[in-house]
Amino acid sequence: MRTKAAVVQDAAAAGLDGLFRARSVALVGATERSIWSQAAFANFERLGFTGRVHPVSRKGGTVHGLPAATSCAAIGEPVDAALLMVPEQAVAEAFADMNAAGIRNAVVLTSGFAEVGAEGARRQEALLAAARSEGVTLLGPNCLGFINYADRVPIWTTQPPLPVIPGGAIGVVSQSGATAGFIAAFAQRQGIGLSHQVSTGNEADVNVARVVDFLVDDPATRVIGLFLETVHDAPLLAASARRALSAGKPIVAIKIGASETAARAAEAHTGSLVGDDRVFEAVCRQLGVIRVSCIEDLVFTAGLLAQVGHVGDRRLGLVSISGGVCEMAADHAEAAGVAVPRLAEPTEAALRAVLPAFGTPNNPLDVTGGAMLDASLFARSLPPFGADPSLGLIACFMDLPDTAEDIAGYRGEIVRQIGAGFRASGRPAVMLSVMTRPVTEAGRALLKETEIAYLGSGVQHGLGAIGRAFAWAERRERGVPAARPPPTTAMVRPAGEQATLAYLTSRGVRATPVTLVRSAAEAVATAQALGGPVVLKIASPDIAHKSDIGGVLLDLEGAAAVADGFDRIVASVRAARPEAALDGVLVAPMRRGNGVELFAGVLRDPLWGPAIAVGLGGIWVEALRDTAIRLLPVTPGEVLEMLSELRGAKLLDGYRGSPAIDRRAAAEAVARIGDAALALGPALVSLEVNPLRATATGAEALDALAVWDEEG
């Protein structure tokens, strides 16, 4: 049986088909005086739109060379979509006219809505309510529109980069219309084609997540590129990203807001908060989204994936005509996390047979300057090089010629010989420029002739793109974690350390036993019953960081030490926090021996919902900030990945004589802590276990605290 979320997801995607594949369009507010109207109308001819275009103007007459209807209702025939280009105060009337004409898809260029404050947000809510009441799909407001290059449907209000690169396979979705244009322009200069470019603006209705879901099913799109300022429907975006990963469609995303300045700018631009950047970074890792920080890396990474696709063997062979470029490429490959293996002896022998006497068979392979005199050296050396069993992808560095004259000369011949060598090698291969450079129309023709995958990226951007493509392929091979059933709802609301540890124990998490005492005599009796050294900790609902104010004493043994410890801990806390309510003192057995203190904390992100952080625990949590984050629920396998991401991961495998911890036991404990937090419901603000003591024999929660929303 299909879930409700799946049904809603399909309905949302189906609703976009009528918009993005519209065959007739009304230009509402069309006028010769508007640069937006002029550009929108011209784009239909520029991109070869074969449908019908209907200018709509109150004054009627002729606009853009066509008779203008005075209203949408006056068009007199069915229309698939409308572009609203009217002033903000006229949007409601224009929308009502569009509805009356039965138009069920709208693109709203007009600004002055949620991005300008509370009053604008109210206007946007009213617009959305009107759209939903009539079943209208609404893109915008405050957006430039979209171009469906694959089906030649341009409802876009600025001039796109021309000429259009045919066969584009990258769908670009941006909350910023201008940035969508910048991405499209840079891609066009690099000879990289798009299938779609979509500006979502304020996202009153259609948001990035819905467009991603549409593109996952779009046959023309092989890679999806995103520019995000915020996320308006995190659950749907997560679901769409999972679908994309399963379908083998990489998502490459820029998400701004890592800095406070960028977050403020984004809020001013879209009227939305950007959310916690650490959580978004975790979402990318978890769902296989490739995160980049600039337009160049978005275009080059998406362009590589669109051309080369999934590479199963992620070991790289580097080839150049320059030894210096080979060395530079090797450095950047290592920085990108890409393995450049040694060649097998048979490969070296085969290369010696074709290289000049002064050449050295190696990876990276310097084919030497001899290729300037005899370009066939590439065609003869690339096949034995590519036959090496250790290689999965070949990257050859050579600038693409720019002019017809160059292409007719030796530079063009070198590229043709590289293409022949690529084809004969039987390996996936890409040619990269040495420095970032555009691709001319003549260069594109040569690439088509030679069937070469190419990036004008330069060494650093190109190898970064390869590293990201390899990482995505590895993530995809691990697959999408199977959906876990939600944990059984807990009918308790633990408050304080003792109750929280007891609750965790009931959910299958091993936790240290603690006893609440209210006198030195009770502390001594409890310690004697435990039969060994103990820990004393203050119990107070008002104190979170007990050790900061002398609220924790370790390794107390004997009646005198325990009694004195009780008095000291109470006195210390009363002196530091006289206003704090004290419930008493907790007595717990002291855990000695080798082990690593971990931290496991569940938080509720306002955009993404419950997430869990894992890191080195104890006093190191805030000092080192070495944590990995995932959305809940998590599997033990996902927690193992999180542990391996920590900067201090070496400590988990034993350090300077200490034994390695049982990572699987620790991962199981963390996954159960996550499930335990989910079971407590939405009123839980956070659940922290610190420390979670991990040893060679298991993991045990030594301290825990649940924080609740008082209004929940």
Predicted regions and their residues:
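Catalytic-core regions of core metabolic enzymes
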Residues: 1-712
